[in-house]
Amino acid sequence: MLRTHTCGELRRDHIDQTVTLAGWVHRRRDHGTVLFLDLRDRYGLTQVIVDPSSNPEARAMLDSIKNEYVIQVTGRVRSRLEGAENANLATGAIELEVQSAKILNTAKTPPILVNRDGGEDEALRLKYRYIELRRERQQHILGLRHRTIKFMRDWMDREGFWEIETPILMKSTPEGARDYLVPSRLHPGEFYALPQSPQQLKQLLMVSGIDKYFQIARCMRDEDLRADRQPEFTQLDIEMSFVEQDDVLDVVERLMTELVANVTPHKRLVSPFPRLTYADAIEYYGSDKPDLRYDLKFVNVGEIVKDSQFGVFTGALSSGGKVQAIRLPGCGSYSRKQIDDLQEVAKIGGAKGMAWMAIEADGSVRSPIAKFFEQAQLDQLKSATAAEAGDLIVYVADKPAVVAASLDKVRREMAKRLDLADKDLMHFAWVIDFPMFEYNAESGEWDAAHHPFCMVNPADVEKMQRGEFEGVRAASYDLVCNGYELASGSIRIHDRSIQQYIFDRLPYSPEEIQKRFGHMLEAFEYGAPPHGGMAPGIDRLVMLLADTDNIRDVIAFPKTQRAEDLMMNAPSSVDAKQLRELGLRLADGVEPRG
């Protein structure tokens, strides 16, 4: 080894020992004749002193070094001078007096700073990601990710799950997003797909009698990106045989509870995890992934305002819409500009406008729409929303989906403005009873709302088989936390006839269904057990544990929102010979970027 200790290891117990360290020059301070260096590796920093009076050769050798040079130093550990200790540094009580030194590698001046955040553009940071990863914050996040995955593996093993790898080269089957396709050289004109998830394979493992499976699974989806999505992502894939919904929820809830307590003990959570139906989540929060760290519930005021003289409200109700409100505590003094700004937030969700009422100190209502309501109606609105003096009530009236989306935007924005979200609280919750089918207004048909292997709620099977699709619930469930969906799962179909029924709801011919899913239908003819599972997203979980809102922060080498790797310049063109071997050529008019 080129070192005897790491740069974060030395303490008072090591004083007077001769040690060798190796690492990067984090910072240099030249105090005339004496040179001070902060030497850095993954484990921490150690202050190094080069004194020419005791070691002129080492001082001369290190005279030309700059930040990020890689060096090796050997010397004696000594106590820092009184008053020079650094309580913020684990090694802050000692320093290393250099006896010999060696430059292992030089370094150009980095395009981004390592010893502090220089506010560089994200594109520059991603291009030089290997330098950004030297930063303390980034190394902390990668360490947190490692501990999270290790805890998952150890925990699943203790619970009797087997870790089994499933293929990366798979068959292309519709699972919601576009597949990444891989052409086959040995079978010209045919393609593999990279897995969007191991969904079918883990179900087939249950048919195989494996009973309890897990995998740290890499998944790829060719979809439009956003701050919490990447084209390739990692999930803890779980499947279990002979289980019902509560069994799966129990396993994942225990895992998450113990993981948070062990990996991030400063974080708190609410236990047991609350359960919301999908209908209630939409009704009260406008989202199937609500942030429950703060209240700001929606209140349906349709019954109160239906006989008012305010045409916006009555018009929405008469056309099948709804009117909902949120009480914003302490915001009654908002200026007209502040309210107009908030109305623009509501419009992002599709609202045409946003009505408001401010509650004055004497309990009276100040609002441009107050004149359209009787005093009894105003009192009812205050009572229904629990509004008090100094509060602001905001309203949106429109189609139910627009009201939900608009007030969800307002709710999240106000939580930021009022600083309502506790960053140290991991507020997990289960969302259950999702609709099994969605009405397609264009086709006039009811389409499956989930992947086609999701089981219908047992209580609604007969209703589904009668063709009464509205209100049929899926045996599916989501784990949400702090406004993000962390995991999605379901009890799976294991009965061939029900699986065939669901496949028949897909927009494919019987021949196409057999081509795409025949292997699943055949497997279910050989004794498939009842089974279910889910797949917590590791990237999003670590994102929350690390207190960041950008998933790229928690992935070693992420892609941009245009699915580009700026460091390796991918995707890139390939030469004509490679295409010919695959039986491919670029379509006319398609020109690679370079």
Swiss-Prot record:
Alphabetically list the UniProt keywords: Aminoacyl-tRNA synthetase, ATP-binding, Cytoplasm, Ligase, Nucleotide-binding, Protein biosynthesis
Which of the seven top EC classes does this enzyme belong to?
ligase
Q: Where is this region: Aspartate?
A: 199-202
Q: Where in the cell is it found?
A: Cytoplasm
Kindly list the biological process annotations in GO that this record carries: aspartyl-tRNA aminoacylation
Q: Where does L-aspartate bind?
A: E175, R221, H450, R492
- Site (Important for tRNA non-discrimination) residue list: H31, G83
Tell me where the transmembrane regions lie: none
Mind naming one GO cellular-component term on file for this protein? cytoplasm
The EC number on file is 6.1.1.23
Q: What does the record give as the reaction this protein catalyses?
A: tRNA(Asx) + L-aspartate + ATP = L-aspartyl-tRNA(Asx) + AMP + diphosphate
InterPro entries named among the record's database cross-references = Aa-tRNA-synt_II (IPR004364), aa-tRNA-synth_II (IPR006195), aa-tRNA-synth_II/BPL/LPL (IPR045864), Asp-tRNA-ligase_1 (IPR004524), Asp-tRNA-ligase_1_N (IPR047089), Asp/Asn-tRNA-synth_IIb (IPR002312), AspRS_core (IPR047090), GAD-like_sf (IPR004115)
**Sample GO molecular function, one term:** aspartate-tRNA ligase activity
Residue positions binding ATP: R221, D222, E223, Q230, E485, G537, I538, D539, R540
Q: List the disulfide bonds.
A: none
Q: Where mainly located?
A: cytoplasm
Q: Which family does it belong to?
A: Belongs to the class-II aminoacyl-tRNA synthetase family. Type 1 subfamily.
Instruction: Give the protein's biological function.
Output: Aspartyl-tRNA synthetase with relaxed tRNA specificity since it is able to aspartylate not only its cognate tRNA(Asp) but also tRNA(Asn). Reaction proceeds in two steps: L-aspartate is first activated by ATP to form Asp-AMP and then transferred to the acceptor end of tRNA(Asp/Asn).
Record text on subunit structure and interactions: Homodimer.
Protein known as: Aspartate--tRNA(Asp/Asn) ligase
Protein's organism: Herpetosiphon aurantiacus (strain ATCC 23779 / DSM 785 / 114-95)
